[in-house]
Swiss-Prot record:
Native organism: Drosophila grimshawi (Hawaiian fruit fly)
Gene3D superfamilies: Cytidine Deaminase, domain 2
Chain ranges passing through the membrane: none
Name of the protein: Eukaryotic translation initiation factor 3 subunit F-2
One GO process term, biological-process aspect: formation of cytoplasmic translation initiation complex
Record gene name: eIF3f2
Domain MPN residues, every copy: 12-150
A Pfam family matched in the record: JAB
Length: 290
């Protein structure tokens, strides 16, 4: 394999959904894992030299430090089962490469790239490097392909070469999108959203909960100060409520809460993107062709 598999005018497109999948995989990675590694799925169009990355899934891996060498072992059975499961719903998607959330290439990248070279059969695998540390306030993405180097009969190696990456997988002409934006700008009427009523409901529930907690604290203080006779039914209900809550320290609760909040925000963002894409596609389908 060589870089000739990818011509200079080859277009590699990355769907935004894949980035959200990689972010989610990084957030839900095993506790001892520093990075997330996974498989990239997509479509190859050899007629116009286009590769579109449309899907991905995380692959479980283990990292071992052997001297100065870092060895990464993938769960190949898990990767195979995930690919077969994806083929049931999306048989047109094939393995086009792999991703890693490390900040830079490592010595183990060559071994992982060799594995995906076998999975991609007659095509060169892509390697997407996504740095999620947000250095400079940006989500840095880099796309590589592997180029074998060395002399015949001697030591051989692999050199990673950067490829251009287009982060929008659309074939719609820019002028069409601009016309849609212009129409919305000239007609700024918007329907009231549902976010504010939902926030008001959350606020009302929170205030009601605070009132009940204040009432409960006053009752406990009055009983301890012998200003009120204790009620066995109330005490039994309090005991059952307290014992039903798992005991955990403040740091564990904070991590669990933040993880759940991230999941909710990712779900909301993804659903909003899908809704916007559907609305935009519907608008574009009704535009006249010029």
């Amino acid at each position: 394999m060589s870089i000739s598999n990818y011509k200079m005018h080859t277009k590699v497109r990355l769907q935004p959904l894949v980035l959200f999948q990689i972010i989610s995989a990084y957030e839900h990675r095993p506790k001892l894992a520093e990075v997330a590694v996974g498989t990239l799925l997509g479509l190859r169009d050899r007629s116009n030299d286009t590769i579109e990355i449309t899907n991905s899934y995380m692959v479980i891996h283990k990292t071992q430090q052997i001297g100065e060498m870092e060895q990464v072992k993938l769960d190949k059975q898990y990767a195979s089962e995930m690919y077969e499961l994806n083929q049931i719903n999306n048989p047109q998607e094939k393995i086009v490469g792999w991703y890693n959330t490390a900040k830079s290439l490592s010595r183990s990248s060559a071994a992982l790239h060799a594995y995906y070279a076998r999975e991609c059969a007659d095509a060169q695998p892509l390697h997407l490097l996504v740095d999620l540390k947000l250095r400079g306030g940006r989500l840095n993405t880099r796309l590589y392909c592997g180029v074998p180097i060395g002399v015949p009969g001697g030591t051989k190696g692999l050199m990673f070469t950067l490829l251009p990456l287009l982060k929008m997988g659309t074939e719609i002409d820019d002028s069409v999108a601009l016309r849609v934006m212009q129409n919305y700008a000239l007609n700024p009427a918007k329907q009231p959203g549902r976010i504010l009523p939902e926030l008001m409901s959350v606020l009302e529930i929170t205030l009601a909960l605070e009132e009940k907690l204040d009432l409960l604290l006053r009752y406990i203080k009055d009983v301890l100060a012998r200003k009120r006779l204790p009620d066995k039914r109330v005490g039994r209900a309090l005991y059952e409520a307290l014992t039903s809550v798992p005991m955990m320290d403040a740091e564990s609760f904070r991590l669990m809460f933040n993880t759940n909040v991230r999941d909710i925000l990712l779900s909301i963002t993804l659903s909003t993107m899908i809704k916007t894409q559907l609305e935009l596609s519907e608008k574009l389908s009704h535009l006249p062709n010029h």
